[in-house]
From Swiss-Prot:
It holds the Pfam family Peptidase_M4. One of its GO terms (cellular component) is extracellular region. The gene is npr. Binds 4 Ca(2+) ions per subunit. Binds 1 zinc ion per subunit. This is Bacillolysin. It catalyses: Similar, but not identical, to that of thermolysin. One of its GO terms (molecular function) is metalloendopeptidase activity. It comes from Brevibacillus brevis.
Amino acid sequence: MKKSYLATSLTLSIAVGVSGFTSVPAFAKTKIDYHKQWDTPQYIGEVWEPEGAKGDDVVWSYLEKYKDEFRIQGNVEDHFEIVNEARNKETDTKHYRLQEVYNGIPIYGFQQTVHIDADGNVTSFLGQFIPDLDSNKQLKKKPKLNEQKAVKQAIKDVEGEVGEKPDFIQDPEAKLYIYVHEDESYLAYAVELNFLDPEPGRWMYFIDAHSGDVINKYNMLDHVTATGKGVLGDTKQFETTKQGSTYMLKDTTRGKGIETYTANNRTSLPGTLMTDSDNYWTDGAAVDAHAHAQKTYDYFRNVHNRNSYDGNGAVIRSTVHYSTRYNNAFWNGSQMVYGDGDGTTFLPLSGGLDVVAHELTHAVTERTAGLVYQNESGALNESMSDIFGAMVDNDDWLMGEDIYTPGRSGDALRSLQDPAAYGDPDHYSKRYTGSQDNGGVHTNSGINNKAAYLLAEGGTHYGVRVNGIGRTDTAKIYYHALTHYLTPYSNFSAMRRAAVLSATDLFGANSRQVQAVNAAYDAVGVK
């Protein structure tokens, strides 16, 4: 029977027993939110006792319980794979990340999270599940294209985007998925094209495995758009390495290293490792890239116990002096790249601590929630980078103010405190719904940015009063949500759920932090 909906979802309540524990949501009923399009659960909140199941079997038993709601025929283990299990030592909770599969093929971006409290009870499910794929006969057929032909199709198309064949950083590869786009499911190859010439790009292509048509494409490259001395003349201290009589911008004390290179105004990466004879560095762009990468590493390590962007100490590599008068900084999937700016729109972009932290947070997001860089999930991707940029550079709530329009005092790229001051929405009712900027990823980030600001600082917005909880607790909530709850296609509603669940995990179901999260998202119109 088809369910009826209000707004984007319907909440179904099923009576269950009440848990007396405050470490998990105090649900008197099971709450299920259904996805508007697929009519399957996108959120389940409850306290469910597994009755003797242990380890992964808890997850499988839980999914078995809801197989009818997911419209699953047969074994649930044929429809999901457990791709990650993480234990939070602070809360003694477990967090499982799942991947939906069909005939052994992963459905691109369709991941789910299942969460287990300290007593072994399942407390929530969050994510998207697409049902009834058996009805699409094309998904059962063998691909007519092989991986090599799919790559060729993508390269041919991107040549039209950039004007010539790019010089790829690494050889492009194709991976087979089931890809859902505009209400249709396709057997498709995902092809990532990463290049620097003739212009930097990190394009994601989805090629129909039968026809060779381009189903969807978008550029994932994030644009900022808009002792030694740094770009602003400030003196910084940072770790280097000495080899013989030469000093190198190479820090071996953090993870597997932090290294800073120069492209010498060319476009080859990583370029040349920065060196000096007396360990007093005068290249401001290099000093800032190195020192700011160290500070960002220290923040995530000391505050969130994360060892580099991948959690395993990966080398943080930065290149400055990229190209000539280049007004951009970006994470290309393996390293940071900074232009020198043109002196009018931008100073050297590594001079902004919040810019460096913003870009490195993209690397963290890529290794955790994997938020797809389009539409609402892309706006959340951008917002997470803004939020942690403001947490690392914590003297204000502006982004890029140190390096943007140096001739104009008080200017910035964005504001978390007042997104509207820079043309960005501060309420869901004002969101951008067009196709520019990958569906408004830099614009609509203002909605979640405003919620984060209100959560930290408090205030009244659209008639809703929020009692702030401070930057520290706010950062803990968003980091927990990013690493444990959000999935590739999470939207704003899922962000609210993830933040509430994270605040519950960290501070308790009846805490002022949970109340503040709910108020903050009420204030920006996210239900």
